[in-house]
Swiss-Prot record:
Entry keywords, A to Z: Magnesium, Metal-binding, Transferase
Similarity comment: family membership: Belongs to the UPP synthase family.
Protein's UniProt name: Ditrans,polycis-undecaprenyl-diphosphate synthase ((2E,6E)-farnesyl-diphosphate specific)
UniProt note: domains: This enzyme shows a novel protein fold completely different from the 'isoprenoid synthase fold' that is thought to be a common structure for the enzymes relating to isoprenoid biosynthesis.
Source organism superkingdom: Bacteria
Catalytic residue positions: D29, N77
Free-text remark on how the cofactor is bound: Binds 2 magnesium ions per subunit.
GO CC terms of this entry: cytosol
List of residues binding Mg(2+): D29, E216
Effect of D221A: Decrease in activity
Length: 249
């Protein structure tokens, strides 16, 4: 065990470099409440949350995390006020316009999961360009869950399998967990070992509900804009001190 140092010293967080989770998923919660506490508009909370994404992406990359999946916008978030939704749809472009050169320099690959075709054209354009420009990178894969819902993902997978079964392309005997995984957005990714949710809420909110069957959950009270490198180190330390049994002893 030895300390992992960030650019600004991390206090008393020893994490084992040999046991860094390959895939960390984060429900970035609390932007609006953070802003309300500070008597600021909700969109200011989302802006500050974007700065946190940059910090955490840098640190996860430095630690050697292979996949970092961030719940950016759910299929349920369309019900929020129109001006807030419009701002959230603008954020991916703002983020990538300012951060993409650094992502390329750090060998980070950008990916998305979710029903991307239903996003506004300018949002799709920004993320598709980032994916194209980073597709050959081999470091951290930064995955944005955009217009993502776990139940809708599962239903979509079932529909695709049913169509293939109906057409005679597959038999019932071929349908297994492994086969089912191939129809999910995350088909080419390992399941998350660690799921983190900020803001004190303790639920999945329809995020990676199939993939997180055996993930370790860490719920912390900090709002997402306050989450930093030390916070992530603490979450990883908690994960490393748990025993993952996968239903065994």
């Amino acid at each position: 065990m030895f300390p992992i140092k960030k650019r600004k010293a991390i206090k008393n967080n020893n994490i084992n470099a040999a046991q860094i989770p390959k895939h960390i998923a984060i429900i970035m919660d609390g932007n609006g409440r953070w802003a309300k506490q500070k008597k600021m508009p909700r969109i200011k909370g989302h802006y500050e949350g974007m700065q946190t994404v940059k910090k955490i992406t840098r640190y996860a990359s430095d630690l050697g995390v292979k996949y970092l999946t961030l719940y950016a916008f759910s299929t349920e978030n369309w019900s929020r006020p129109k001006d807030e939704v419009n701002y959230l749809m603008k954020l991916p472009g703002d983020f990538l316009n300012t951060f993409l050169p650094e992502l390329i320099e750090k060998n980070v690959k950008v990916e998305t999961i979710g029903f991307i075709d239903d996003l506004p054209d300018h949002t799709k354009k920004a993320v598709l360009e980032a994916k194209e420009k980073t597709k050959h990178n081999t470091g951290l894969t930064l995955v944005f869950a955009l217009n993502y819902g776990g139940r809708k993902e599962i239903i979509s997978a079932v529909q695709l399998i049913a169509e293939r079964y109906k057409s005679g392309e597959i038999s019932l005997d071929e349908i297994s967990e492994t086969h089912f995984n191939e129809y999910l957005f995350t088909a080419n990714m390992p399941d998350p070992e660690l799921l983190i949710r900020t803001s004190g809420e303790e639920r999945l909110s329809n995020f990676l509900i199939w993939q997180c069957s055996y993930s370790e959950f860490v719920f912390i009270d900090e709002f997402w804009p306050d989450f930093n490198e030390e916070s992530l180190a603490q979450c990883i330390s908690i994960y490393q001190n748990r025993h993952r049994r996968f239903g065994g002893l």
